[in-house]
Amino acid sequence: MATDLKSYIKVWDDVVEEDFCQNIIAQFESDIPNHNRVDREQRPKFTEYNISERYEAKDPAWTQLQLDIQELFISYTERYIDQFQLGPDFPSRYCFEQYRIKKYATSSDQFKDHVDVQDYNSARRFLVGFVYLNTPHQGGETRFPKLDLDIKPVTGRMLMFPANWMYRHSGQPAIGGPKYLLGTYLQYL
């Protein structure tokens, strides 16, 4: 059973094949008109792509990928619940926020220290889920500064952790190439 905050930060390796990750990156890179550049003075700074919007638009490039991604996150949410014996304490009804790809393209792209629940609109979030789609040459860690913990981005690695204020984190700059991240949040219904 978990006894400290770090225990609730869970990493699984090889949750998807490299080909699956490469396919998502290729689809992302082939649809530049639907990219959204976010630049709030590195809080955050990256390029974002909303997979769920493309799915809802019935884009054939994303239909099966969205379903596969959803099944992946459902499966690992169940593992998270089981590992920490959260059954009776875990929300009985929840949903996933839209699935998004984030590309940290250059050494200036990053997401400085933040928490994922900031206001009324984000207060439904309770668990963060990331899948790293590539392994940058250097850097790109998800850093938890108050917990003295860095999670290295590795192709096919999943990271889950609570979304609240105790889990302040940052997306460190990737050096020598981009970092691609697939992410979502679990939300209360």
Task: List the model feature ranges, each with a label.
Residues 1-158, 166-189:
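Fe(II)/2-oxoglutarate oxygenase catalytic core
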